[in-house]
Regions:
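N-terminal Rossmann-like dinucleotide/flavin-binding domain of flavoprotein oxidoreductases
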Residues: 169-218, 304-325
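Well-formed, non-transmembrane alpha-helical positions, independent of function
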Residues: 28, 51-52, 76, 192, ...
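N-terminal Rossmann-like NAD(P) cofactor-binding module of classical short-chain dehydrogenase/reductase
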Residues: 221
Length: 325
């Protein structure tokens, strides 16, 4: 017997940030049956799992998404390797893949969906044939993961980051409304790197081509990220939109960097149709700005239908008083 629909089982951290959020309306089940009860609800913390079992709320823990983020979750709990657990962030990109009928991917687990590779194991990393130094330029999520796996292979890793902190875009994006838990993407990797003796991290260290060449390191990995365009080229327009130079244009990067927007209404034109346009609209509205949301789609953020969020996204903007066109 299932007492919850899939959309509620698999709520995202954007709308259900608390681990074990279903407990209040599922704890009655143990009182009406002597059958073993399995419960879910974004249970990512071993402490929470143990607590629910000891309290008699559940007999078993269902951890589908947490096990996608870290397939070795049960082993790590059993072996007391708690600090090595790569916790699910509840973004539902895995659910979106399932809804699309394509191989499942995971923001936290880059090896998800690669299990078909014969003779390959995500935690058995082949040692470097020749120990040598490698340079990773950029310490956002991709750069951190690259540095971590190179270090696992035994290379001497130099990680260079232009800014004053590690994490890249995920640091600023996780400051937007509803996305705080996404910071786990950087937190996990930063912690693992800090435990390694063969990793040297340099902050506030922008490098140009000449400086990279002068280091004399044979293998260089560039993970410097990307920025949003300001010219209007996107899903609906393959050429720049005329007249944008006559108004103040901001990108999500500007908003995440804390740009001062000044007085007057803010128009958000969402031609990307992913999740971020609605997040920015919700965030700015929450800060007290008068927000108008314009989209080329028939609904707000159609991608979020695949992550089971769309109705909550659109309903939330309406409740905030955001004009939608």
């Amino acid at each position: 017997v299932n007492v919850s629909g899939w959309g509620n089982d698999s709520a995202t951290s954007r709308f259900q940030p608390d681990s074990g959020y279903q407990t209040e309306y599922t704890k009655f089940v143990k009182q009406v049956t002597n059958k073993p009860v399995v419960g879910v609800g974004r249970l990512t913390s071993p402490d929470m799992m143990v607590s629910l079992i000891k309290q008699g709320v559940l007999d078993f823990i269902g951890a589908a998404r947490p096990s996608i983020a870290d397939p070795f979750l049960p082993n790590k709990i059993q072996q007391q390797r708690i600090e090595e657990i790569r916790e699910c962030i509840g973004c539902n990109v895995c659910v979106s893949c399932d809804n699309l009928g394509v191989p499942i991917r995971c923001t936290q687990n880059p090896t998800m969906g690669e299990e078909w590779r014969r003779g390959w194991h995500p935690e058995k990393i082949a040692a470097a044939k020749t120990p040598q130094s490698v340079l990773v330029v950029g310490a956002g999520p991709a750069g951190l993961e690259c540095a971590l796996q190179l270090a696992n292979r035994g290379y001497e890793v130099i990680l260079s980051e232009a800014s004053k902190q590690l994490g890249g875009r995920v640091i600023s994006e996780s400051n937007l409304k509803g996305l705080a838990i996404w910071r786990r993407v950087s937190d996990y990797r930063i912690y693992q790197l800090q435990q390694m003796d063969n990793v040297n991290i340099y902050l506030d260290s922008a490098l140009d081509v000449q400086q990279v060449l002068e280091l004399g390191i044979e293998h260089v990995f560039v993970a410097t990220g990307a920025l949003w365009r300001k010219d209007g080229i996107g899903r609906s327009s393959r050429t720049p939109i005329l007249g944008l130079d006559q108004v103040a244009i901001y990108t999500p990067d500007d908003i995440m960097s804390g740009a001062s927007l000044g007085p007057g209404p803010i128009v958000i034109y969402d031609d990307e149709q992913g999740y971020l346009g609605s997040v920015v609209a919700d965030h700015l509205s929450d800060l007290g700005h008068d927000v108008i949301f314009v989209t080329s789609a028939s609904i707000v953020s159609p991608f979020t239908e695949l992550t089971l969020e769309q109705k909550q996204v659109q309903r939330g903007l309406v409740a905030q008083g955001v004009g939608i066109y």
